[in-house]
Amino acid sequence: LAAVSVDCSEYPKPACTMEYRPLCGSDNKSYDNKCNFCNAVVESNGTLTLSHFGKC
């Protein structure tokens, strides 16, 4: 099974769009889009990872 990853190098960003393209984090929480997910990754100091694309 290939690991899924997201490039969060451009983050954090002060504001995210309302775009809905859900991602599921390793915390079993669904994030509405890459921006929201990447901001959470930065806040977690890299402990949060992507579980899979789509809702949890």
Curated annotation (Swiss-Prot):
Avian ovomucoid consists of three homologous, tandem Kazal family inhibitory domains. Disulfide bonds join 8-38, 16-35, 24-56. Residues 6-56 form the Kazal-like domain. GO terms for cellular component: extracellular space. The lineage of its organism: Eukaryota, Metazoa, Chordata, Craniata, Vertebrata. This is Ovomucoid. It comes from Lophura diardi. Keywords: Disulfide bond, Glycoprotein, Protease inhibitor, Repeat, Secreted, Serine protease inhibitor. It is found in: Secreted. Glycans are attached at residue 45. It comes from the Eukaryota. InterPro entries: Bifunctional_prot_inhibitor, Kazal_dom, Kazal_dom_sf, Prot_inh_Kazal-m.
